[in-house]
Amino acid sequence: MEEFQGHRELYRSWQHNFFYPLIFQEYIYTFAYDRGLNKLILLENVVDQRYSLLTVKRLITRLYHQNHLILSVNDSNQNEIFGHKPKKNLYSQMITEGFAVIVEIPFSLLLISSLDGKEKKIGKSTNLQSIHSIFPFLEDKFLYLNYVLDILIPYPTHLEILVQTLRYWLKDASSLHLLRFFLYECRNWTSRITSKESISFLKKRNRRLFLFLYNFYVCEYEYFFVSLRNQSSYLRSTSFGALLERIHFYGKFKYLVKVKDFAVILWFFKEPFPHYVRYQGKALLASKGTSLLMHKWKYYFIYFWQCYFSVWSQPRRIYINQLSNYSLDFMGFLSNVRFNSSVIRSQMLENSFLLENIRKKFDTIVPISPLVGSLAKAKFCNVLGHPIGKSVWTDLSDSDIIDRFGRICRNLSHYYSGSSRKKNLYRIKYILRLSCARTLSRKHKSTVRAFLKRLGSEFLEEFFTEEEKVLSLILPRDSSTSGGLYRGRVWYLDIICIHNLVNDQ
């Protein structure tokens, strides 16, 4: 009955666009700290033992008193719970986590209402949730395009921009004021969050709230951009024997005009439809148009961010590149359009001809340098790529050590399965294999050679090639490959995030 009452109150608040009272409800904090919804935050902060129901009740009691809404982080008396001193910002952290759940409510309800009656249609497109679905799209479209804009989406230069972007959707003024309080409450924050240190601190402070605000900011920008892209499929042009210049960005004319008694037809040029993909803060805009058109798109983005979001984006954050001469560094892959030429001999009666056939191919390559840097940062090798033992794992059992190394290899193999050239991936797996052997030999106070000689070289080889053997059983083999392992390209439809070693910056 209490759960039903809570849902009814939630619905009434949604009807009136009024979410501020929900901050006083206990079930909001239950949602915020449920391990299924907020597992990453619990694992990082390791403070779940102190977020008990009694702590939540004490927090809500203090919230009812205006004097305790703003909690001093330096007052040790206010911050004592159950006789010990927790983190300085325990209560403030709890409020921000609960508020992050509250601001997601209207958008979750809008999503549910938009999906009502469309279960069958949505069910067919669930595979599009995988980030690997981007690469088949790039393979199909980028082969026929000329230029690409490599865009780094700028962060808002002021915290108030995030609030102003949200206020068009969230009509509750009290909630907006509370959001401002959370954003400016931290002493370590400045009025600008453009530096990498400030962004990192904001993520650690409240990852869920930060991701919501940033994703909403990006979605607002993309909403306007998609509208522009749909309207710019046709551009109005004037011509007098030659194309002079586009004078409007929207609309088109479908009639004739008289210029000096000569009938001049207004030419209609269909704009090369641009293709847009984005992951996190990096986006790609590719088109079949000319270099002049791409420069117009570039400066449109700069002026658009400046005018609509008060965000200054430097021109060097947007690069114009020709696809035939450029490798895209996107989502952990190096991708490029490669030309494959083949010579075909054609015989016609007594004459023979040599025909050169040029075919485009979209290549996805595993970048070796960033991955070696990530492995060196994680202490699996040095900066030159020479494997070293993971000393902090020597206290674990042999099976746990092998399982951890094997899990990393499986994740990397799983993510880079669509690479057209896997030589670099095998180098990374070789580094991890020797690092595992060095870790085990260090634990048993032996040398790597003696350890492998005692257990056999197949001890680790079979384990680290497990996924390739599974693929070779369910997919056709390439007779030219050795060992019977599968060397083809596979894109998985169950990958929703990039592995930490892939996404390390």
From Swiss-Prot:
One Gene Ontology term of the biological-process aspect is: RNA splicing
Q: Provide the Gene Ontology terms for cellular component.
A: chloroplast
Q: Where in the cell is it found?
A: Plastid, Chloroplast
Lineage top rank: taxon: Eukaryota
GO: which molecular function terms? RNA binding
| The keyword GTP-binding belongs to this UniProt entry's keyword annotation | no
Q: Which UniProt keywords apply?
A: Chloroplast, mRNA processing, Plastid, RNA-binding, tRNA processing
Assign the protein's first listed, main location to one coarse class. Answer: plastid
Answer yes or no on keyword Transmembrane.
no
What is the role of the protein in this entry? Usually encoded in the trnK tRNA gene intron. Probably assists in splicing its own and other chloroplast group II introns.
Q: Which protein family is it in? A: Belongs to the intron maturase 2 family. MatK subfamily.
The protein's name: Maturase K
